[in-house]
Amino acid sequence: MKIEIFPISRLEATCQLALLARNMPGRTMDIAELDKPFGLTQENREKLAPLSNETRDRLEGDGYPDTILDAIDSEAEARIYEEARLEATEVNGKDALIRTDIDYDKTDDVFGESNLDRMKAGRPPLDADGNKIELHHIGQKPASPLAELTGAEHRSNGNDNILHNKLKESEIDRADFGREREDYWKARAQQVENQRLEGNT
């Protein structure tokens, strides 16, 4: 087999994309940067955009009170609550963001307890996948309003780092929060029962 070698100038051998990149240095980037994983870390969470006036006004129009709006730290945090479609109300004398998608009559597969029965006993209801609804302190202070979130909304997709500043010591006393959770769910159960008596649910 005979191989012929043709001389090629350096310019002809360079691909057109490389030439374009060379002519537009301000619009190119190091390809190695694309391989680096992107994710919100505790170290870069301070770069999150703060809650804008526009978002604050929108949430206020949706009924969010100042106690909740003042506790929301960033646009990303507000987006978590909006995407969860939480509604503002008062629970146990404190502002809260509650879920509207809880099936109070849904029973768990193990004990046959309904979500409403669980709540009456001070335990969290279960979501559609059978996972416990979690409570989050908006603003991470003991007196902060609470938000009802699924585990995924609370901790997945970078939400854990958006919602929790782990670079400082938590102000939440876990034992006190355990009692607060129990009282919260009992109060929510009472609200649901009252609404049912009034014919609203």
Model-derived regions: residue spans:
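Nuclease and nuclease-like effector domains acting on nucleic acids or nucleotide cofactors
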Residues: K2-I133, G139-T201
